[in-house]
C-alpha cells in the first residue's frame, strides 16, 4: 500500500511539475489528480525553503517574493499559468460557441497576456506584504489551488471528448474523492495554530477562505463555460493561489 502510494505520488509529481525525478516503468498516470494537493504542498515546501534561504542572506522582501514567484512558474513548467492564459483568451470571445476553439489555439492573445500579468503581480505583491510564516502560507496557497482543481474535476462536466484533462474525470468521480485532499488542507491550516497558539483566527479564516475561494473559482469558470477543460483546471489553480495570498495579507 505504501509503495503504491509513493509510486502514484511520483507519477503526480512528474505529470504536474518539472522537478527532475527518475522515470520508473509502469507508472500509472491515470490517477494523478487524486494526489495533486500533496504535490502542491511539496511545491510549497520547495518555495518556502528558497524564501527562507534568501531571507537568511538578507535579501529584500520584494526581490525574494519576485524570485519565489519565478521559481513557482519554473517548478510547474508554466502548466497552470498557460491554462489560465488560454482560458482568459477564450472568455474574451463574445460567441460562446467559439470559446473552446479559441482556448485550443496555441497563440496567446491580449487577454491571455493580461491575465498572466495580473496573476503574477497579485502573487508578488501579496507575498511582499506577508511577513510571518511565509513557508506555511506558500504551502497553503499551493495546496488550496490544487484542491480547487479537484473540485472542478469532481463537480462539473468535462467539455471535450478528448484532451489532456479528460482522464482526470475517471480518477475523481464524486464529492467523496475530495475528502482526502480537504483533510490534508485542514491539517496544513492547523499548522498556523500549532506553531503559534495565538493564530487560531488565521487557522479558521484560512480554512474557510481557502475552501471557499477554491470552490467559488471552480464554480465561476463552470458558470462561464458550462463545464471545464484542462485549461480551466489550470486557471482554477492559478487564481485560487493568487486570491488566497491576497486574503492572507489581511491576516498576517
From Swiss-Prot:
Keywords from the UniProt entry: Cell inner membrane, Cell membrane, Cobalamin biosynthesis, Magnesium, Membrane, Transferase, Transmembrane, Transmembrane helix
Subcellular location(s) of the protein: Cell inner membrane
Pfam families: CobS (PF02654)
Reaction equation(s) it catalyzes: alpha-ribazole + adenosylcob(III)inamide-GDP = adenosylcob(III)alamin + GMP + H(+); alpha-ribazole 5'-phosphate + adenosylcob(III)inamide-GDP = adenosylcob(III)alamin 5'-phosphate + GMP + H(+)
One term of GO molecular function: cobalamin 5'-phosphate synthase activity
GO biological process terms held by the UniProt record: cobalamin biosynthetic process
Record function comment: Joins adenosylcobinamide-GDP and alpha-ribazole to generate adenosylcobalamin (Ado-cobalamin). Also synthesizes adenosylcobalamin 5'-phosphate from adenosylcobinamide-GDP and alpha-ribazole 5'-phosphate.
Family of the protein in this entry: Belongs to the CobS family.
Protein name: Adenosylcobinamide-GDP ribazoletransferase
UniProt lineage: Bacteria, Bacillati, Cyanobacteriota, Cyanophyceae, Nostocales
Name of the gene this protein is made from: cobS
Amino acid at each position: 500500500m505504501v509503495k503504491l502510494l509513493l509510486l502514484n505520488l511520483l507519477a503526480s509529481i512528474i505529470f504536474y511539475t518539472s522537478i527532475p525525478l527518475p522515470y520508473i516503468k509502469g507508472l500509472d498516470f491515470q490517477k494523478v489528480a487524486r494526489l495533486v494537493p500533496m504535490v502542491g504542498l511539496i511545491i510549497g515546501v520547495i518555495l518556502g525553503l528558497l524564501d527562507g534561504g534568501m531571507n537568511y542572506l538578507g535579501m529584500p522582501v520584494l526581490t525574494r517574493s519576485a524570485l519565489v514567484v519565478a521559481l513557482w512558474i519554473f517548478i510547474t513548467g508554466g502548466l497552470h499559468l498557460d491554462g489560465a492564459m488560454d482560458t482568459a483568451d477564450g472568455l474574451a470571445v463574445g460567441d460562446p460557441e467559439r470559446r473552446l476553439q479559441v482556448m485550443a489555439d496555441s497563440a496567446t492573445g491580449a487577454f491571455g497576456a493580461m491575465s498572466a500579468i495580473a496573476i503574477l503581480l497579485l502573487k508578488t505583491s501579496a507575498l511582499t506584504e506577508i511577513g510571518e510564516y511565509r513557508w506555511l502560507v506558500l504551502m497553503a496557497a499551493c495546496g488550496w489551488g490544487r484542491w480547487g482543481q479537484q473540485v472542478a474535476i469532481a463537480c462539473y462536466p468535462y467539455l471535450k471528448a478528448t484532451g489532456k484533462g479528460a482522464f482526470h474525470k475517471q480518477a475523481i468521480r464524486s464529492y467523496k474523492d475530495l475528502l482526502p485532499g480537504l483533510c490534508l488542507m485542514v491539517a496544513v491550516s492547523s499548522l498556523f495554530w500549532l506553531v503559534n497558539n495565538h493564530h487560531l483566527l488565521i487557522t479558521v479564516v484560512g480554512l474557510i477562505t481557502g475552501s471557499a475561494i477554491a470552490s467559488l473559482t471552480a464554480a465561476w469558470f463552470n458558470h462561464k463555460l458550462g463545464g471545464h477543460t484542462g485549461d480551466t483546471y489550470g486557471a482554477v489553480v492559478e487564481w485560487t493561489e493568487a486570491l488566497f495570498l491576497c486574503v492572507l495579507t489581511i491576516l498576517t
